[in-house]
Each structure stands twice: as structure tokens, then as C-alpha cells.
């Protein structure tokens, strides 16, 4: 942990800020994030770059949120993080099971836009993660997907 989160300081020794989730550059360099189309789905692929663990870390108050808007303006989203429940969907963070993770969202055949946002949230009181109160966010990626047949 210390080699990344406590780098050498300008004055000798190491920097004890333990830079991580509040360092925008560090967040944006953790993964290469690419959006592409596969039929009527948006595929967001996360490829590990500068992070030695799942992203975000196991803190339940941090997550990645993928937001996509289809040609009609409809919003679809997915939350990636550790959950307070057991089972196969309890942890869907990138890099839990390898160096590349892909998620899929339905967007239809028209053009679409997407954003990937790192969020700090107050713990949701329901299983619907979309109602969690976001206390801080950093945009990690954004892009546009052409209509099917035009890409």
C-alpha cells in the first residue's frame, strides 16, 4: 500500500497524506475506461492501469456509477461497489476477479452518451442503491456511442 499511497516527499522521507480517493489524478489513472457498442448494449470496459486492488477499495461508502442516456433521453445506470448483502452480486467492483472488467447496459439502436463517476455516498437505507445520498463525486470518463450501423 505504502509504495503508491505514501510516495517519497520533496523533503525526504515519505508523504503521509495516504493519497487515494481524494486525489483526482490518482482516481483517473487507476483504470483505462472505454465505451463501445455491442448490438443494442453499451459495453463499458475497465482495464487495470495504476491500481493494485479492486476499484474502488472495499469501503462500502465508495462506488463507481455508470450512467448512460439513450437517443430518447432515457437514463440507465449501474452501481459498481461492495454491497452489504451476500451472494454473487455482493461485490461487482472492477478488478475483483482480474485485470479487466466489462459491464453492459441496454441503450437500444440509437446514439447514446455515457459517464463513469466515482462517488462517495452515505450508506443507502434501502436495497435501491440509486437513492443513496452522494456526498462527493469525480467524473472518470465520458463519451458518445454512435447509432447502430454507424459505428
Regions found by a protein language model. Give the residues of each.
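Short, conserved sequence motifs used for protein processing/export or organelle targeting and
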Residues: 3, 7-151
